[in-house]
Amino acid sequence: MRVIVAEARVPFARDGAQLHAHSLVTQLRLRGHDAESVALPFHGRKDELLHEAAAWRMLNLSTSNARTVDVLIATRFPTWFARHPRKVVWLIHQHRAAYDLFGTPYSDFTDSEEDAQLRAQLTALDSKMFAECERIVTNARNTARRVQRFNGIAATPLYHPPPLAEQLRNGPYGDYILLVARLEPLKRVDLAINAMAHVDRSMRLVIVGDGSQRVALERLAAQSDAAARITFTGALWGSAVADLYAGARAVLYTPYDEDYGYVTLEAFLSGKPVITATDSGGPLEFVRDGVNGFVRAPHPEPVASAINRVAADQTLAERLGRDGQSAARAITWDGVIEQLLG
């Protein structure tokens, strides 16, 4: 089949959505399909959202170079606005600031009449575009619940392996807790930094990632009693990240209401337990408290108590990690491609 994967790309950012689209194109090609990614820049400013949706609507992707494109796979807002007779949505997320993040500190939408009208427009337009689609699946149950809640659409969750899957491996259970995330407010890296003041001094925190909050987070870490035990590596990719997963005692991942979250599965495929929060969303679809990790309230002391459990008991960390690894290995690309292409 000839397949286009539609991608709304944030310039100069390498986020989960971009990795998702790249992995999908790669896996389609490995299975003999002629697959390409089509991307338009996405900025996400309120005053640009309708213009960005209109730009996608102007695209007719049913043919390319005088040849038929069999399927268009849309991924995140506003890629499903593109025109194609056989459009499938593999929903990563909608424009969350107008939906589930509205009313939280993570949204730039206010209670103003103007913003209320824009939110209503976006909801109506999304619903109209979804009605054009042959099939709607999501990357996680959490995402499916949102589209059901806001648009009244039933969607099937479709899990897929993380991009690093082939490079991840078991390794020694070292003296550090690993945190891999973009340094943005939704990832709540400050929670991990504040927790370290309550963590046994034998444990370090290694933070992998970059983003708009890096300077503020480095300043927060420098002011902490645990400053000497907190390291920022910046953005790392490929084997460099896999090596850090392999050597960690456990992985800390406490975002706010994550859609899916590759980090959970990357940790499990490395045989490491995951510590997450009760409101972290996607990770809760995989992390079972006391079985393959810990689920704690999103506050420094409870998170620190979970870290201290694995710090004091390496055997426990190994047992939890083994359980997570077996579950993560059951997620494969073959089933994903079959469901997407029908």
Question: For each of these PLM feature ranges, what is it?
Answer:
Residues 107-108, 112-136, 144:
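Membrane-proximal helix-turn-helix segments that form the acceptor-binding/catalytic region
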Residues 168-187, 193-200, 206:
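Conserved donor-binding/catalytic core segment of Leloir-type glycosyltransferases
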Residues 218-236:
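Nucleotide-activated donor-binding/catalytic signature segment of Leloir-type glycosyltransferases, i.e.
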Residues 235-236, 243-248:
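Short alpha-helical donor nucleotide-sugar binding micro-motif in glycosyltransferases
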Residues 256:
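Aromatic "clamp/platform" in nucleotide-sugar-dependent glycosyltransferases that forms part
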Residues 289-301, 309-314:
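Conserved acidic donor-binding segment of nucleotide-sugar-dependent glycosyltransferases
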Residues 309, 316-330:
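A short, well-ordered alpha-helix in the C-terminal region of glycosyltransferases
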